[in-house]
Amino acid sequence: MQRYISLSVSLSLLSGANALVRPDGVGRLPALGWNTWNAFGCDIDASKVLTAAEETINLGLKDAGYEYINIDDCWSVKSGRDPNTKRIIPDSAKFPDGISGVASKIHDLGLKVGIYSSAGTETCAGYPASLGYEKIDAESFAEWGIDYLKYDNCGVPTNWTDTYTHCVPDNSNGSKFPNGTCPDISNPAPTAYDWSSSNTAQRYNAMRDALLGVNRTILYSLCEWGQADVNTWGNGTGNSWRTTGDITPDWSRIVEIANENSFLMNYADFWGYPDPDMLEVGNGNLTLEENRAHFALWAAMKSPLIIGTALDSINEEHLAILKNKPLLSFHQDPVIGRPAYPYKWGYNPDWTFDPAHPAEYWSGPSSTLGGTLVLMFNSEDSAKHRTAVWSEIPELKDSAEKGSGYRVTDIWTGEDLGCVKDQYDVELQSHDIAALVVGESC
């Protein structure tokens, strides 16, 4: 039986000790950007990518900190590589000026550009991938002006699969994970097994080394779905690493991923961040409250915030969520790298692994907000009250005594809620989240 890592693990496991440190601070803070996949899937071309870049500026997203415009799967010729150079060939029907032409135009807008490949023989959509061609592809990416690589885990040949299976309690791997354990896992690793020696780690390290060998700094985003206990080696390999299978614009999937990622927060710090996948804000049939909770949790966890909706048709409410200044300020804190942590589960007893009801109470220190970030989440299907008790919040409990008051600000409205004594109670609609800055004592 294998158990998912919890926040109670030793702080010696925190990211940073063996981090992949890049020039100019690239990857020190979690990435902010946009990606084609959740909006368009394989139906991409230069026009859609450039429209997203232009809208990133027009909508004020660049000013809010979003900087990467990322091209996901399906950008190349599907039939194979150039027979002479062995390079991947951009699809000229989709990208008439090549990837370099698009990259140049994006750079002219003051933004950065990302590309996609996989640590296998083909991508998830069946296009040429980079296993065995890492050096050639890294050189191509650098020559084209690429700033970000999302590196997936599809097309892995049998000789590159892992000897053992790691516990990833995600619905993409089954449905029976009692409190985050994997009792039915096939071929579990020995207790002392070093996953950094696994084939998965070696496949991802090969591209890391190739990227480090080119004359361009390229942020490296691992998309290995939480496999091979990536949390124990991902920080030395890439700037972020996926912790689960793919997200979808379904509330049940969003809270499932939030639950899984919440147990991995001790691995997040400067230069390395567990990645619960790209944002679905603005997609599907999510309610306003669900969009808000999704974004607030991802920002509080200091996950990469990669927008995945069509920006030329986004509505004002969704745009306002993506541009929320206090949450982005917490997310991009230059002094404090650690994310918010759950301090109370609320609906469940503490430390309960529940795909439908993640931890509901979160807090985190901030050098930018003038106080502590506090989230209260209603995971239930009807309106409920939630109460933040100052003496329960780790950042406040040493100074909070009965009758203690703090200046409180509502992050969503910007409203100064005044001097609040002892606790703050709020009624939340189904799947909504309260976000507060708890500031100076009063």
Swiss-Prot record:
Residues bearing carbohydrate: 159, 173, 179, 215, 235, 285
Residues of the signal peptide: 1-19
Positions annotated to bind substrate: 224-228
Catalytic activity entry: Hydrolysis of terminal, non-reducing alpha-D-galactose residues in alpha-D-galactosides, including galactose oligosaccharides, galactomannans and galactolipids
GO biological-process terms attached to the record: carbohydrate metabolic process
Enzyme class, broadest EC rank: hydrolase
Entry's localization field: Secreted
Disulfide bonds: 42-74, 124-154
GO MF assignments: alpha-galactosidase activity
Pfam families documented for this protein: Melibiase_2, Melibiase_C
Keywords assigned by UniProt, alphabetized: Disulfide bond, Glycoprotein, Glycosidase, Hydrolase, Secreted, Signal
Enzyme Commission number, as recorded: 3.2.1.22
Any one of the GO CC terms: extracellular region
InterPro entries from the UniProt entry: Aldolase_TIM, Glyco_hydro_27, Glyco_hydro_27/36_CS, Glyco_hydro_b, Glycoside_hydrolase_SF, Melibiase_C
Domain of life of the organism encoding this protein: Eukaryota
Family: Belongs to the glycosyl hydrolase 27 family.
Known function: Hydrolyzes a variety of simple alpha-D-galactoside as well as more complex molecules such as oligosaccharides and polysaccharides.
Name used for this protein in its record: Probable alpha-galactosidase B
